[in-house]
Design a protein with these regions (language model features):
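N-terminal, motif-rich segments that launch catalysis or mediate targeting to/interaction with membranes
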Residues: 18-138, 149, 154-273, 277-327
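Positively charged n-region of N-terminal signal peptides that target proteins for export
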Residues: 1-5
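Bacterial N-terminal signal peptides
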Residues: 7-17
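Functional cores that coordinate and move charged inorganic groups
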Residues: 140-144
Length: 327
């Protein structure tokens, strides 16, 4: 029997076109549960449906509900913040140094992740099940965003280099087409001795891929006729999506995926490791509280067999029950 969702209704979520999409975010959060050491894995596995489905809720707040404070949490335009030694240490300092418009335009992603870690650690200390699950699932989304190179760049959609559309192509369309072939098994999570440093190391590593990503796409676009880069309508014009953006052809997506040489899969795996490790770090820093009494023993026992089966699948790089429109 598959694990049952405890005390939370299932979320029915439509496809989000930006920010890894459902395909990426759900896989990252679900695999991160499998990468947790025991006993933390047991607790998270009891709620794996919620952790998985809630992975895209920050995008729903951003796009469907238009929460005005949500957008800047998803990105950090590194080039516009000056030298690294001048970065504010936390969100409070950032708000003192920069005005609201600057932060809205350029993002607060790394500081928001650190702020979320403080809240998650507190929730673990208090053994507040609802807050643990909500914060952990949300945190997984932002860590996923922190592994998308263009979420760390001012040239976030190639708009500064005549490459518009590259953002959603890289993080949504490519996973849609190819994620079912990715092997997403990673080693167990580890504890970060310095959370602040771990966050900025993650951001810097991701940002180092932004220009190579753009260069690969630029070279390939230049060498490919327009009618092969984009899908064309009956009149021979570039087909536009409902968001009025050009629709890339599957053939171009395949070529770009090949040229990127595993970058998308690699970043997803890094995101899985980081998500599990930040969850684990918050739990350890909270004193490793015993969470076994937050769920009924009967539910944990019932889920034990499914956990073993899913663990065996995960060791092979597979995740149970993950589908998308191309499967």
């Amino acid at each position: 029997m598959r694990p049952k969702l405890i005390a939370f209704g299932a979320l029915i979520i439509g496809f989000i076109t930006l920010s890894w999409g459902i395909v990426g975010h759900e896989r990252i959060n679900k695999a991160a549960v499998m990468a947790l050491p025991h006993p933390l894995q047991t607790f998270f596995y009891n709620h794996i449906d919620f952790i998985t489905q809630e992975a895209s809720v920050p995008d729903i707040r951003k796009y469907a509900l238009s929460y005005k404070d949500e957008g800047p949490r998803h990105y950090f335009d590194m080039e516009n913040f000056g030298s690294a030694d001048s970065y504010p240490k936390n969100l409070e300092e950032a708000k003192k140094k920069y005005d609201a418009k600057f932060l809205s335009d350029n993002g607060i992603l790394p500081w928001y992740i650190e702020d979320m870690m403080v809240k998650l650690t507190k929730a673990f200390k208090e053994k507040n099940r609802a807050e643990i699950l909500f914060l952990a699932a949300d945190l997984g989304h932002y860590i996923g965003d922190a592994h998308m190179p263009l979420h760390t760049s001012a040239n976030h959609d190639g708009q500064l280099s005549e490459q518009k559309g590259i953002h959603s192509l890289w993080e949504s369309r490519l996973p849609e087409l190819f994620a079912k072939n990715y092997k997403l098994n990673v080693p167990y999570a580890h504890h970060y001795e310095d959370v602040h440093k771990a966050i900025w190391d993650m951001i810097n590593d991701t940002h180092s891929l932004a220009q190579p990503l753009l260069d690969i796409d630029k070279k390939l676009r230049t060498a490919t006729p327009e009618n092969q880069v984009f899908k064309m309508d009956a009149e021979g014009k570039v087909l536009k999506s409902k968001y009025n953006t050009a629709v890339f052809s599957d053939e171009y997506a395949k070529k770009l995926h090949e040229q990127l040489n595993g970058m998308v899969e690699s970043q997803m795996k890094k995101a899985i490791t980081a998500t599990a490790s930040f969850w684990y770090t918050a739990w350890v820093d909270a004193g490793k509280p015993d969470l076994s009494d937050l769920d009924s023993p009967e539910v944990t026992k019932r889920n034990a067999k499914a956990l073993k089966e899913d663990w065996d699948l995960f060791q092979k790089g597979d995740l149970f029950g993950m589908r998308n429109q191309n499967d």
